[in-house]
């Protein structure tokens, strides 16, 4: 078996690494560089350029040079972030037939995984040239806060590039592997990985422990923003230059695609220079021309000015850090080391902000551009069986569940659960003789299902006629090691089952994810009220069902007055159930239970008489029912409602 290579598929730059024995090796590409720009150019003659060669010709071919394709991967065209990018990118972002965001190049529509596959192909070739043998297997990294659709799309990109993707691994986790593997410290260490790359931001809290000579990397929590990175910092510089030039020369460069491409290059260069010097000159001769002749651009940019332009972007990274610390159940003082990953963390202001939040100097012994690829290569060695002393325990970033009676979100797997994981719960039907149930799968933190993101739905049909609550429908959630979700439903009585894998075209935007979490906090009280109303309603409906059934079976044992009293209480409760008044529902439920007490006594008396008649048999029956009760412990008192198809 050949080597499993590690690839960091970045928004701005990509990197490939391998393991040589116990040593990691970042491989130089054909131009001799250890990182490759994630830029793809489509030439007029059909040739495709990738990396530095694509970057060099971007100024003369802006409409057919694609960069930051990772920002579009697994996303819908209508998403706010995609719409924002449409106005900024020189190339055309278009809507695909399935609603996804694709790119149009030379009259041809291309999916982001197709474009990213070109970068992966270059990484594959880089490794093959170095090893002198074909490479077919890889571990590819993604931002920890990537959702199901984005992970699936990244896997698809690998397949398009001719790679069998053995594992999708989270970038901060990979960086922790690279950092922690050669550390000889005994005892547990908690580290924070702050990963600010070209297009995405992640933070993970990871515990590194020595367990019987094995290094265990356990992710305690993760958070982030998949639409925040170096590209946004560059854009602030570009906007500033455009504004200054307009003031000086009266010319607006924002509509000139050739000028924009030169500005992008200059902005990135200035940003990098200002990490080491206090000011830089942005000098672009012949940037444009008007009736009076050619115009030259010459602007001084100081580090202080840059910091003021991007202050809010840096500040945006702190809230996810705070949430990650809280979700991990620790305090900032418990963090032993802070690791910086991603090129943007070279910016002094970013380092200063991180130091201010975590109260300690970030480590400088990790290469922010290479650590992620190195970690992916280590994981590749673990998967190939060549390394036995590493155990990696990652997590899922958001809660997953299904909609149950009353529109409640019944969470099956909560956020920050270690993966791979599998969880099953038994539900039942909401109506008598219900032939099918619709399983709706949601992702998010809200208590009411409709406030979360619908990932997919499917039917389980052919349920034999039975009274409500009798059929046993087992719903299974299974998240694999790549963080991809599979859901199944099985009728325990008939053995019939149905399964769904959440597909890439049902992606979740980072904005939606953040909105869900924020909404969950803001609307916690509102959700609580709705939840209490649903619970009261479910209780009331169950009471109506039970009493009505008992009345039909044992009503003849009551005198007419008692029976009428119960029937009236049932009517009152049924009327209350149609309202939104929880207090009224509770009151009428209590009234019905009180009114039906006599009926209960009659039923209890009959049962006692029957018991006395066969005392010996009763003991055996009791032991049998105890066993049955134990078996039913995993049955949850929640119900799935059938969605009637018109």
Swiss-Prot record:
**Which Pfam family, just one, is annotated for this protein?**
HSP70
Modification Phosphothreonine occurs at: 200
Which CDD domains does the entry link to?
A: ASKHA_NBD_HSP70_DnaK-like (cd10234)
Induction behaviour: By stress conditions e.g. heat shock.
Q: Where is the composition biased (Low complexity)?
A: 607-631
Instruction: List the SUPFAM superfamilies hit by this protein, alphabetically.
Output: Actin-like ATPase domain, Heat shock protein 70kD (HSP70), C-terminal subdomain, Heat shock protein 70kD (HSP70), peptide-binding domain
Source organism superkingdom: Bacteria
Region feature Disordered, mapped onto this chain: 606-646
| Molecular function GO labels | ATP binding; ATP-dependent protein folding chaperone; unfolded protein binding
Q: Which UniProt keywords apply?
A: ATP-binding, Chaperone, Nucleotide-binding, Phosphoprotein, Stress response
Its annotated function is as follows: Acts as a chaperone.
For this protein, the record's PANTHER family field holds: HEAT SHOCK PROTEIN 70KDA
Family per UniProt? Belongs to the heat shock protein 70 family.
NCBIfam families the UniProt entry points to: PRK00290.1 (NF001413), PRK05183.1 (NF003520), prok_dnaK (TIGR02350)
Name under which the protein is recorded = Chaperone protein DnaK
